[in-house]
Amino acid sequence: IITSALSIQDPRERPMDKQQASDEKHRRFHDKESDFLAFVNLWNYLGEQQKALSSNAFRRLCRTDYLNYLRVREWQDIYTQLRQVVKELGIPVNSEPAEYREIHIALLTGLLSHIGMKDADKQEYTGARNARFSIFPGSGLFKKPPKWVMVAELVETSRLWGRIAA
């Protein structure tokens, strides 16, 4: 779920003129310790809604929840493709959902250059090669930043932001 989510453009939309409204809609998926797990929460919600609603009603739901329907479909397609490849390679799939620790150890192996330690005086982190970044405002960790953080990507706009954090 997380791997396929990270391989596409984020399905959560945050229009400039509706940032607060979209943040409120997306907040229900937040995990207080990990934005990566927010993808799992969103995935579970979408699965429940897709089963309960007609195709058109599901599209409308995506629009009102500030979710891009085409990106959601792409996410689902990539997830299905990854499951098929894993099956063909004979790699065992968890029968139970993985725990927080196992998920983040697995993620950390691919994100070593995206680790940061919080500066005691500021809301900034110092990462690899002394890169200084802040947690993105849309993150579930933005208001209560941890001492150490791992982010999926660093994006430079008005400043350097760490997006999708744990």
Role assignments for model-derived ranges:
Residues 1-166:
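Second RecA-like catalytic domain
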